[in-house]
A protein has these predicted regions:
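A domain-level signal for the mature, folded cores of soluble proteins
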Residues: 17-126, 139-260
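Fungal secretory targeting signals
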Residues: 1-19
């Protein structure tokens, strides 16, 4: 089944609103690079939360949920595509005659709970990475317990050209991303791999809030044990720590060049 971004999906599922269910921000794609054919698509196993919006349209931080009770209690809104975003940031660097880009796509979850007895933490940020050379995806990465793991795209089953990532419970521990298996069927209520509405770092805006104001809030908010992997204080380090072999070192100038 073809992958769809959130804005193109029929909103056929509903759920009761809760205090942490912020309506999603409007789509805000980057203007300095075209990601429409390369963004990842996601599924979410039934043993974990569905994604939420980490920041509200009015700039409020999501308060998250305490990791108690049911592992999935209070964090599986059926209409989650109305209530979540994919936070994107990228950098591109020319080396010789080639252009290399690294893209991070981060999702927020209300909690990351290990067992019904507790364990884990309020808030979770997990992300996927897409690495391109001359606009062609060469590698994809998934986050797991504070690290990023890359796989050559030739080894991955595509979803109409988009790499497929699954958010799952990692054994007896907490939750993480992983690559989808060949032929894996989506478990989320929409019945297909999806991408919550993308908001890119230098394009996202709130209701009456500028891009700079929203970025400043995301840079400042404390999500406890969870970390946004593309903030100003860590994005360049993360890019260079996890760039695939053969990719040049990204620079501060390459981050600046991603601004519109």
């Amino acid at each position: 089944m073809k992958a769809f971004a959130a804005l193109t999906l029929p909103l056929i599922l509903v759920s009761a609103a809760r205090g942490d269910d912020f309506p999603r921000l409007e789509e805000a794609l980057p203007r300095t690079v075209d990601i429409r054919s390369t963004y990842p698509v996601f599924d979410f196993d039934t043993d974990g939360c569905l994604p939420s919006a980490g920041i509200a349209r009015d700039g409020r931080q999501n308060s998250g949920l305490k990791p108690t009770g049911s592992i999935t209690g209070g964090c599986r809104a059926g209409n989650f595509l109305d209530l979540s975003n994919t936070l994107h940031r990228h950098a591109c660097l020319r080396s010789g005659t080639d252009t290399y880009c690294g893209h991070f796509y981060a999702l927020y979850f209300l909690k990351d709970q290990a067992t019904v007895l507790g364990g884990g933490h309020r808030h979770d940020w997990e992300h996927a990475a897409v690495w391109t050379k001359n606009g062609v995806v060469t590698h994809a990465g998934y986050s797991a317990h504070g690290k990023l793991y890359n796989v050559e795209v030739a080894q991955l089953p595509p979803q109409y050209g988009h790499v497929k990532i699954v958010y799952h419970k990692d054994g007896v521990t907490t939750h993480a991303m992983r690559m989808a298996k060949a032929g894996e069927v989506a478990e989320n209520g929409y019945g297909q791999f999806v991408t919550p509405t993308i908001i890119s770092w230098y394009e996202l805006r709130g209701d009456g809030l500028t891009n700079e104001q929203m970025r400043n809030k995301l840079n400042a908010y404390d999500y406890g044990s969870a970390t946004i992997p593309l903030r100003d204080n860590n994005f360049l380090t993360n890019l260079n720590t996890y760039r695939p072999a053969g990719y040049p070192e990204f620079t501060a100038a390459s981050l600046e060049a991603s601004k519109p």
